[in-house]
Amino acid sequence: MNTELKILMAGVDEVGRGPLAGAVVTAAVILKKPIDGLTDSKKLSPKQRNLLAIRIKEEALAFAYGRAEVEEIDQLNIHHATLLAMRRAVEALPIQPDNVLVDGAFTPQLNMPCKAIVQGDSLIPEISAASILAKVLRDEEMVALDKIYPGYGFAEHKGYATPVHKEALMRLGPCKIHRRSYSPVADLISK
């Protein structure tokens, strides 16, 4: 009889702190075993991310998403909204982890041990997996929002402050999914 207890570790990461538009999306992942190719989602091509996301969903012991909407970002600020989204992802896991590792320098308030790891998305497979799932989901959402709010180019820049996005903001004004607390959105509204 195997008396070894496996400690369940969840990795958590976020996508979407910097954009001018859209939600901040988080994921929490508990892996059964390592998955080849896991790394920070920003180091992967969209095709690589999509293929790995499929494998993660198939092979992970558990995964869940969390989010903070634009209104929450504007009310709380991006730091607190991100921590809220991270907590939501962990609480949505169908299996409670024994401990949680979070990419970055801060951790959400949880009922289990939690540690922040700077550059954890490149170092810890569970955080890498969370990074990939969050990135794929948020990118898909921004492509869908591009159809609802045409003219801003969300499918291309995913809400980040590119020259194309800033020009569209000047021309069209902000839409419902723009973060009013972010410059240049706030600057445009105050004019």
Swiss-Prot record:
Its UniProt entry gives the catalysed reaction(s) as:
Endonucleolytic cleavage to 5'-phosphomonoester
The superkingdom listed in its UniProt entry is Bacteria
- One BP annotation, GO: DNA replication, removal of RNA primer
Q: Which compartment or compartments is the protein found in?
A: Cytoplasm
Q: Which UniProt keywords apply?
A: Cytoplasm, Endonuclease, Hydrolase, Manganese, Metal-binding, Nuclease
Q: How is the cofactor bound?
A: Manganese or magnesium. Binds 1 divalent metal ion per monomer in the absence of substrate. May bind a second metal ion after substrate binding.
Per the record, the major location class is: cytoplasm
> How would you classify this enzyme at the top EC level?
hydrolase
For the RNase H type-2 domain, which residue ranges apply? 7-191
Cofactor requirement: Mn(2+); Mg(2+)
Among the GO molecular function terms of this UniProt record, one is: manganese ion binding
- Any signal peptide, and if so, which residues? none
Cellular compartments per GO CC: cytoplasm; ribonuclease H2 complex
Q: What is its EC number?
A: 3.1.26.4
Cytoplasm found in the keyword field: yes
Which residues lie in coiled coils? none
Per UniProt, where does a divalent metal cation bind?
D13, E14, D103
Q: What does this protein do?
A: Endonuclease that specifically degrades the RNA of RNA-DNA hybrids.
PANTHER family per the UniProt record, alphabetical: RIBONUCLEASE H2 SUBUNIT A, RIBONUCLEASE HII
Which HAMAP family has this protein been placed in?
RNase_HII_B (MF_00052_B)
The family classification in the record reads: Belongs to the RNase HII family.
Instruction: Please give the name of this protein.
Output: Ribonuclease HII
What gene, per UniProt, encodes this protein?
rnhB
